[in-house]
Regions:
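Active-site residues of response regulator receiver
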Residues: 52-53, 83
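Conserved acidic carboxylate
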Residues: 8
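Acidic, metal-coordinating helix/loop segments flanking the phosphotransfer/catalytic sites
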Residues: 30-48
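His-Asp phosphorelay/catalytic-motif detector in bacterial-type signaling
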Residues: 45-47, 73-78
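Alpha4 helix (beta4-alpha4-beta5 surface) of REC/receiver domains from two-component response regulators
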Residues: 59-63, 85-110, 117, 121
Length: 129
């Protein structure tokens, strides 16, 4: 089954999504921040990455995604960004345009909380490409 890396500073979210995705047969690794996430990538090659936007700083997710895209072999790995920014600061991120996806270095932005079945649907959508 596919391998997924989840990078988020919310331990409850990490644990919940990991348990759910593992119950669906996915191999899941988690990281509690950007540095830990980048370190995990040295020994774990995910088929998809779920990354939070606001971790250590408001833009940490963007920095993480940019660094991932610079790593050999990970340029085309789907990255789904999860964020509560629309609810927390009223800032909406639209990943529907090619230009927006280009500067964000993500394939799609999902607004937290993401219902687990919806998350599974998105994961399956991107992994089937």
């Amino acid at each position: 089954m596919a391998r997924i890396l989840i990078v988020d500073d919310d331990r409850d979210l990490l644990d919940g999504q990991q348990a759910f995705l593992e119950s669906k047969g996915y191999e899941v690794q988690t990281a509690a921040g950007m540095d830990e996430g980048l370190a995990k990538l040295s020994g774990f090659e995910p088929d998809l990455i779920l990354a939070d936007l606001m971790m250590e700083h408001y833009d940490t997710g963007f920095v993480f995604c940019k660094k991932v895209r610079e790593l050999p072999g990970l340029k085309n790995v789907p990255i789904l960004m999860q964020t509560a920014a629309p609810k927390e600061i009223g800032f909406t991120l639209d990943s529907h345009s090619e230009k927006a996806r280009g500067w964000m270095k993500v394939d799609e932005v999902l607004t937290k909380p993401v219902p687990l079945e919806d998350l599974l649907g998105k994961i399956e959508q991107y992994l089937s490409r």
